[in-house]
Amino acid sequence: GAWVSEHLPHFSKIVDEVSFLKACSSDQFNHAPAQLLMQTGGARLGRPSIGSWVTYGLGTENQNLPGFVVPTSGGKFPDAGKSVWGSGFLPSVYQGVQCRSEGDPVLFIKDPAGMDRDLRKASIDAINKVNEDEYKEYKDPEILSRISQYEMAYKMQIAAPEVMDISKEPEYIHEMYGTKPGKESFANNVLLARKLVEKGVRFVQLFDWGWDSHGAGSEDALEIGFKNKCRQIDKCITALIFDLKQRGL
């Protein structure tokens, strides 16, 4: 058991299924370096994020989806930028792929108007041929990562739309998570995370903004903003823990 805020009534029922990490400390007080320290182990740019290390070490179980996926919500971006899910000095193929909870989860996942699959494949093959020639000349390993990323992008156009469409989930699942397909929300991303894990994505890390509760506006104030954020996460994270367990994940 553990003490839980009264603003997380659903979560309080499953605390025995959760690990609490209390041994962390930091001398970083600004947002960006603190975010980098937490995600990469160092307060300066250039180190791989935790998801990159896991994917580098363990690989992925699904060759048609990235091994490291980053659903984002909250309407803002980290102060440290994409470095919080970057690959640092590892090949860029291990960096996180950002997903949104509204609109197309991944930008440019659909073929442009007037381009069919055969034409898209031919264009990627042509680009990769140029990259292969460039690699033969310069032997830069990052060129190989670029080739892999183009191939992954093509595969994702087939696999991603189905996996990332939460609208086809049963009604009881939407009720359990509190999801509303088509609208930007943390809950939608939590359900998406479960679907991605089911499909063999090795590392899924959710980022949600709006927790800096010391501003002057109502949504930034501790009395209002903090309670609202708790309300947004309480039901869905509880559902995720329960759902993963019942599916043997």
Annotated model-derived regions:
Residues G1-L249:
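Ligand-binding pockets and gating/stacking loops
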